[in-house]
Every structure is written in structure tokens, then in C-alpha cells.
């Protein structure tokens, strides 16, 4: 089985965890379950199928594909942050971030800044490109040689440290008819959360793309929440 995913990276292999391919009149009932995935994978795929419904389940990852850092201090030269290394494993090599997960490592390319309290993206920040000098200060604290005060970022705000890569969506619907997602929540993805392509009569009710309660995270999908390509109905 092979397929190409629009508007994403094109890795040689897309590891698929739940392949729902060549099926007719199938109902998947999650009963409110949380499906927790490991590594960079495509959790759900509906392909070359008709009248498949997925119901009452949530999708998340054991290790978020991005790393969240809480700002504790800013000045005109540096930004100090704290990172929970258990939740977001990383190493500092040659004074640069190397983020780690099951079967993958990657450096930093940019960050997004989220406001304390509201959880909104801080105005006029968007993706801020950076891969500069990092100095461990002991414990969970690090000093970044990066003046973020000039961007309006303050202590208490959250930086989502990320790479520009977007290898895999959270759920792919490909060459399928009459597919429905009912109360399906996509909490994290390394690309778009939901991608529907070359399909027709797709239906989604309830659920959506949102932070999973209790994680303390502010970020979900690596790109669009939903993306439709060559789809009708």
C-alpha cells in the first residue's frame, strides 16, 4: 500500500498505526477511549473505503512533537525558560537544542509564543525563526541568547519550540466515500490534524482539534486543523 499526502513532507515511509483500507460498511466504536501513539506516525488512515465511520475516540501522542517552554525571565540580551524534561526530552549539543522522541531527534527551527492566561498567540509573533545558543542553568532552567522582550513576550508566557518539518497528519482520508468522524478529538499531530483528499461525502460532527485536558499544553496541530484537497460532496 502506498500513498502521497498533499502539502506535507514526502518521507519514504508513512508509518500507519490504524489502517482502515478496502473496507465497506464498517463502524469503529471507541467508547470514549484515548489512543496514545508513540513516535512520528500517522495514527488513523481511511483509504479506498466506503461508508466507514469512526466514533467516540481521542488521538494523542505520548511525546508531543513540539516542546513547550515557560518563560521565567526576559531582558535585552537573554530569555530564560523552564522545560519539563520528562514531558519533553532533549539534549543540549554544541549549545543547541536537540529534541528527542521515540525513534527521532531534531533540532529547533522556530517557535510560537502563547500568552499567559488567554492561551492566544501573541500578536505579531507568528513563527519566530531561531536556532541559537542555549546555556543550561541547572534543574529545568535554560538561558537562551535571544531577546524576546522586544517581541512583547513576558514571564509566564509559553514558547512552543519546533522544527519546520511536517511529516505526518493525525488522520488521513484518501480515496474514500461516505466517511464520517463522530466525536473524534485530535489532540496533537506533526503535520495537519485532519487531511481529506481525493474523497467525497465526508462528514464530521463533534470532537475537533483541541488540547487534551490535564496535559497543560497550549499547542495542538503542526499545521492546519483541517485540510481538504480534491474533495467533493
Regions found by a protein language model. Give the residues of each.
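Generic recognition of long tandem-repeat/solenoid scaffolds
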Residues: 77-86, 123, 132-149
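Extracellular beta-strand-rich solenoid/capping regions of secreted or surface-exposed proteins
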Residues: 2-27, 36-55, 62-84, 164-176, ...
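Short, exposed beta-strand/loop patches in secreted or surface proteins that constitute
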Residues: 28, 66-76, 112-114, 119-138
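Long amphipathic alpha-helical scaffold regions
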Residues: 199-233
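Extended Gly/Ser/Thr-rich low-complexity repeat segments
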Residues: 58-60, 87-127, 148-170, 176
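Charge-rich, low-hydrophobicity low-complexity segments
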Residues: 146-150, 187, 192-195, 203-206
Amino acid at each position: 500500500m502506498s500513498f502521497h499526502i498533499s502539502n506535507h513532507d514526502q518521507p519514504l515511509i508513512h508509518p500507519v498505526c490504524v489502517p482502515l483500507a478496502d473496507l465497506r460498511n464498517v463502524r469503529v466504536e471507541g467508547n470514549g477511549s484515548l489512543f496514545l501513539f508513540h513516535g512520528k506516525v500517522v495514527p488513523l488512515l481511511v483509504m479506498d473505503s466506503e461508508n466507514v465511520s469512526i466514533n467516540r475516540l481521542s488521538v494523542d501522542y505520548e511525546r508531543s512533537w513540539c516542546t513547550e517552554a515557560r518563560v521565567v525571565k526576559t531582558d535585552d540580551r537573554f530569555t530564560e525558560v523552564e522545560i519539563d524534561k520528562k514531558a519533553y526530552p532533549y539534549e543540549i549539543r554544541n549549545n543547541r537544542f536537540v529534541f528527542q522522541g521515540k525513534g527521532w531527534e531534531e533540532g529547533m527551527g522556530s517557535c510560537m509564543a502563547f500568552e499567559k492566561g488567554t492561551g492566544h498567540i501573541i500578536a505579531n509573533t507568528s513563527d519566530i525563526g531561531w536556532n541559537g545558543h542555549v546555556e543550561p542553568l541547572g534543574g529545568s532552567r535554560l538561558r537562551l541568547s535571544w531577546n524576546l522582550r522586544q517581541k512583547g513576550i513576558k514571564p509566564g508566557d509559553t514558547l512552543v519550540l519546533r522544527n519546520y518539518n511536517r511529516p505526518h497528519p493525525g488522520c488521513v482520508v484518501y480515496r474514500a466515500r461516505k466517511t464520517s468522524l463522530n466525536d473524534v478529538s485530535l489532540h496533537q499531530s506533526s503535520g495537519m490534524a485532519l487531511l481529506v483528499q481525493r474523497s467525497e461525502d465526508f462528514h464530521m460532527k463533534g470532537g475537533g482539534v483541541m488540547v487534551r485536558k490535564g496535559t497543560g499544553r497550549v499547542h495542538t496541530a503542526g499545521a492546519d486543523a483541517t485540510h481538504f484537497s480534491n474533495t467533493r460532496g
